[in-house]
């Protein structure tokens, strides 16, 4: 089973409200903040909405 390491690399300033909500829901705050989330369809869907703001790596448990 793999997890996803998600890092916010661009600011959410001047972004759409929906994109800001997705960033907050994933647990990201400031630039360079990193979280580990499970690799599932819901997480992947959220990441697609903010793909231009983040970097994603797969990590093994």
Curated annotation (Swiss-Prot):
A GO-annotated cellular component: cytosolic large ribosomal subunit
InterPro entries in UniProt: Ribo_uL30_ferredoxin-like_sf, Ribosomal_uL30_bac-type, Ribosomal_uL30_ferredoxin-like
GO biological process, one term: translation
Keyword Hydrolase: no
GO terms for MF: structural constituent of ribosome
Alphabetical UniProt keywords: Ribonucleoprotein, Ribosomal protein
Pfam families in the cross-refs: Ribosomal_L30
Coiled-coil residue windows: none
Transmembrane segments: none
Record-linked HAMAP family: Ribosomal_uL30_B
UniProt family annotation: Belongs to the universal ribosomal protein uL30 family.
Subunit structure: Part of the 50S ribosomal subunit.
Protein name: Large ribosomal subunit protein uL30
């Amino acid at each position: 089973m793999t997890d996803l390491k998600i890092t916010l690399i661009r600011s959410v300033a001047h972004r759409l409200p929906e994109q800001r909500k997705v960033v907050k829901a994933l647990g990201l705050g400031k630039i360079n903040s990193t979280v580990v989330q499970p690799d599932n369809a819901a997480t992947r869907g959220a990441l697609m909405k903010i793909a231009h703001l983040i970097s994603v790596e797969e990590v093994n448990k």
